[in-house]
């Protein structure tokens, strides 16, 4: 029998959170918040495709509230999570649900989130694997593998020459090692998304330097 390996007790019992299930609420909040960070703007419409277990229990376990809360930028312990749908409505964000109770999704707690406004659309697939832990498996049709258990920097920027060099130079100045980097773009010269996993949890000074780089729209750091 294969043994399961956990990095900490929180992989088993989950984080401090609002809601009954770390998989269906805490993980869902984290997925939504990651998608919000990648999008980097106020959305006008968000479509949630829910598969298998997510689809069957999304209302009873509060997965719907958790996903929307994440899109609104809330954390797992935010007391406003039960009101997230109301808050989204007040902000003029249209929420659409696509329920797929039976599918061939590789994990039962899978969602594909499509976020739109007048300028752009992105699509992200994420899974909640337990204890509030998540994996991001697809971004705009590109297969990626991010577990978000390591410190991660998400940068939205204009697709211009030298951007990768500017960012890596900023990290190098503070002796921050890059473990993995994924870069995708809408098309040449348009907005691009850079997702960087690093070995250090102390990146605040480097992040401030990165924010000063021209043609950069949004930077978020997840410890």
Q: Where does each model-flagged region fall?
A:
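Gly-rich Lys/Arg/Thr-decorated short loops/hinges at beta-loop-alpha junctions or inter-strand turns
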Residues: 9-13, 146-149
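Conserved phosphate/anionic-ligand binding catalytic regions in large, soluble enzymes, centered on
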Residues: 14-32
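A structural-propensity feature for long, helix-poor, extended segments
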Residues: 47, 51-90
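A conserved regulatory-domain signal marking ACT and ACT-like small-molecule sensing domains
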Residues: 95-97, 104, 121-223
């Amino acid at each position: 029998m294969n043994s399961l390996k956990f990095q900490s007790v929180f992989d088993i019992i989950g984080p401090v959170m609002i809601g009954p299930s770390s998989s269906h609420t805490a993980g869902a909040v984290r997925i939504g918040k990651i998608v919000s960070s990648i999008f980097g703007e106020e959305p006008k419409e968000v479509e949630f495709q829910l598969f298998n277990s997510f689809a069957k229990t999304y209302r009873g376990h509060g997965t719907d509230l958790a996903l929307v809360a994440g899109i609104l930028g809330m954390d797992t312990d935010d007391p406003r999570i039960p009101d997230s749908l109301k808050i989204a409505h007040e902000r003029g964000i249209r929420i659409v649900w696509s329920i797929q109770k039976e599918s061939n999704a590789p994990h039962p707690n899978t969602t594909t989130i499509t976020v739109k406004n007048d300028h752009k659309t992105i699509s992200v697939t994420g899974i909640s694997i337990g204890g509030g832990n998540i994996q991001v498996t697809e971004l705009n049709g590109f297969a990626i593998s991010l577990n978000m258990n390591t410190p991660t920097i998400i940068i939205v920027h204009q697709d211009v020459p030298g951007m990768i060099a500017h960012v890596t130079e900023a990290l190098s100045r503070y002796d921050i090692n890059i473990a993995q980097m994924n870069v995708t773009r809408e098309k040449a010269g348009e907005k691009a998304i850079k997702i960087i996993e690093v070995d250090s949890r102390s990146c605040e000074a480097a992040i401030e330097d990165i924010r000063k780089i021209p043609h950069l729209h949004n930077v978020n750091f997840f410890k």
